[in-house]
Structure formats: structure tokens, C-alpha cells
């Protein structure tokens, strides 16, 4: 799984009409949509009560248009970049030619009291062409729901990096949430004696997680806030990743892992070394500890990695090889 260096990209010539059917304004769903638009110049739509002529800002210098469902159905080649429960009711109205992306198993959670129509009852996913962006997700969807999908790697847009650097040794740029294990990073910070080697935290926060898990871990001393919705990722108009040595991402997603996330690709693109959770790495063969990334699964181990000096030249060189399929892929 995840051996994508030899990934062959199928040809495509149809212009897609991208539709974002979800509430989140931060995270991987948003970033995936942004890279598709910037890379292939597709148009973006959302569904509203009425059609608006004016465009609204989506972030990252991208605009979208609100359409009523009737007008949405007039568009060619509908492509759902993400869908959450707030928009499930729209899916039965879409044509069978619609394409849809499933990003991770959390979108496929089942419930006896509130069935998930994507995979329960109506099994709406069977009506569409389904794409998955990690092979673990592709396998999970097939093994558990007998729904086939096509695996395609994340598309990556090569943005310009022309801003002054933020200048620190290590950052984390994922959402601050339960599945991101930000508490593990903060516990490592407590063990690192040199303040310059501690991890600076950026990203949108789940306030429930912060309240229950991070309250006693000095979170607000290390959290620098949300970064601007632009590329390169900036804080106070300084490039967060430029000249940064390490990007720490302790993500674990049940029934997922092994492949890439946008935080990984952004780090690799800007020459940072990834420090990943070992459980994520074990789910595939793409990332190789000590070859194209580093790994930890405890605060003590992470603190040691960040405290020790090492030559990272080879790690950066090997990780750069992982980016090519994402630059070449066609969607």
C-alpha cells in the first residue's frame, strides 16, 4: 500500500464543477478544494436557498458562488469535494454522473439512531463515482461497505514562497483536536530544556478539546493562533514553514493512516522534516522512519528528537521524492 512513486495519472479533459457541501472552514477538506482550484482553475460552488450573482470569499484568494439546488443541477460534471451531515439531504437529488471524494473513515461513521445515508439505508455512495485519497480509506470503504472507489493522491499546487521566514525550529500546523494529539506535543514541550527547540503551535482549535485536554499543559503559551488562509502559510505576514527544521504531526485516525495529508505535503514542499506518529506510519509503506521522516509515539521520544542535533540533508532529499505524484496527478 501507498507505493505511489510509480503512480500513473489517468488523463482527464473534462472541466469539473466543484461543490463544497460542508460546514468546516479549516482543515483538509478546505485545503483539498483549494489545491484543486488553484491547480486546475475549476470553479467552486456552494448550495444555498437562492442563487447569488455575486461571489463570496472562500479563502486562499479563491471565491465561490452560492446556487440554489435547481441551478446547481444545471452545471456539468458535478464534483463534490467534501460532504458532511448538514448536506446529506442534497445528495439524492444529484445525477448519477456526480463524482464525490471521501477523505477519511470519520465520514463513514454508522449509527443505529441516526443512520449515515452515505453507507447505511440508501447507501448514497453507490449512486456516484467515488474517489478516496488514501489507500487505507479505499480499503476500509470496500471491506466494510462493499463500495468500490478509485484511489487518487492529493493534488498539490506549487505556490510561491516569497515572504520573510517566521524563524523557529519546530511547528505543528494541523487542527488542534483529539485526533491530532496536540496534548502529546505539549507534554514533549514540557520535557525540552531549550526553549528554542520547543514546538510552536498553529491552527484552528477545537475548544472542547482545549478545555478538557490542554488546560494544564500551558497551551496558550505555545499556541500562536490560526494562520492566515493563504499560501504560503503565514503568521504576522511571516512564512511559518520557511527555514523551519521540523513539522510535527501526531495525527492518528482510526482505520486510516499511512498516506499523506496536506500538512505533510506543505512541510515537504518547503523543505521541512516531518515528525509523524509511529502508528500513522505503520498503516502503510510510503513513510519510512529514519529515511524520509522521523517518528515518535510518546512525549519522551518526541522531546528527544527535538532536542538532539542531527544532519537532516538526507531526510529532506528522500522526502522530496514523495511530492512528485501529487504535482503530476490529474483530477
Give residue spans per PLM region.
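Nucleotide-sugar-dependent
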Residues: 180, 248-265, 277-285
Amino acid at each position: 500500500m501507498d507505493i505511489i512513486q510509480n503512480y500513473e495519472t489517468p488523463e482527464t479533459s473534462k472541466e469539473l464543477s466543484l461543490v463544497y457541501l460542508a460546514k468546516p472552514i479549516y482543515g483538509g477538506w478546505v485545503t483539498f478544494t483549494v489545491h484543486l482550484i488553484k491547480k486546475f482553475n475549476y470553479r467552486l460552488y456552494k448550495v444555498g436557498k437562492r442563487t447569488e450573482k455575486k461571489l463570496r470569499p472562500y479563502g486562499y484568494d479563491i471565491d465561490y458562488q452560492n446556487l440554489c439546488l435547481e441551478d446547481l443541477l444545471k452545471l456539468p460534471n458535478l464534483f463534490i469535494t467534501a460532504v458532511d451531515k448538514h448536506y446529506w439531504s442534497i445528495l439524492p437529488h444529484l445525477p448519477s454522473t456526480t463524482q464525490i471524494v471521501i477523505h477519511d473513515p470519520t465520514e463513514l461513521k454508522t449509527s443505529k439512531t441516526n443512520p449515515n445515508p452515505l453507507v447505511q439505508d440508501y447507501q448514497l455512495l453507490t449512486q456516484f463515482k467515488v474517489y478516496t485519497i488514501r489507500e487505507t480509506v479505499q480499503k476500509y470503504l470496500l471491506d466494510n461497505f462493499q463500495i468500490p472507489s478509485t484511489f487518487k493522491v492529493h493534488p498539490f499546487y506549487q505556490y510561491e514562497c516569497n515572504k520573510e521566514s517566521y524563524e523557529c525550529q519546530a511547528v505543528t500546523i494541523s487542527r488542534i483536536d483529539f485526533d491530532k494529539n496536540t496534548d502529546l506535543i505539549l507534554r514533549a514541550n514540557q520535557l525540552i530544556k531549550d526553549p528554542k527547540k520547543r514546538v510552536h503551535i498553529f491552527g484552528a482549535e477545537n475548544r472542547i478539546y482545549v478545555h478538557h485536554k490542554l488546560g494544564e499543559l500551558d497551551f496558550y503559551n505555545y499556541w500562536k493562533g490560526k494562520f492566515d488562509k493563504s499560501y504560503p502559510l503565514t503568521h504576522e505576514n511571516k512564512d511559518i514553514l520557511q527555514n523551519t527544521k521540523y513539522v510535527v504531526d501526531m495525527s492518528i485516525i482510526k482505520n486510516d493512516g499511512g498516506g499523506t495529508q496536506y500538512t505533510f505535503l506543505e512541510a515537504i514542499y518547503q523543505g521541512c522534516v516531518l515528525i509523524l506518529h509511529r502508528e500513522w506510519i505503520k498503516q502503510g509503506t510510503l513513510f519510512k522512519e529514519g529515511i524520509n521522516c522521523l517518528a515518535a509515539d510518546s512525549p519522551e521520544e518526541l522531546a528527544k528528537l527535538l532536542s538532539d542535533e542531527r544532519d537532516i540533508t538526507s531526510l529532506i532529499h528522500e522526502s522530496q521524492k514523495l511530492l512528485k505524484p501529487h504535482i503530476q496527478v490529474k483530477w
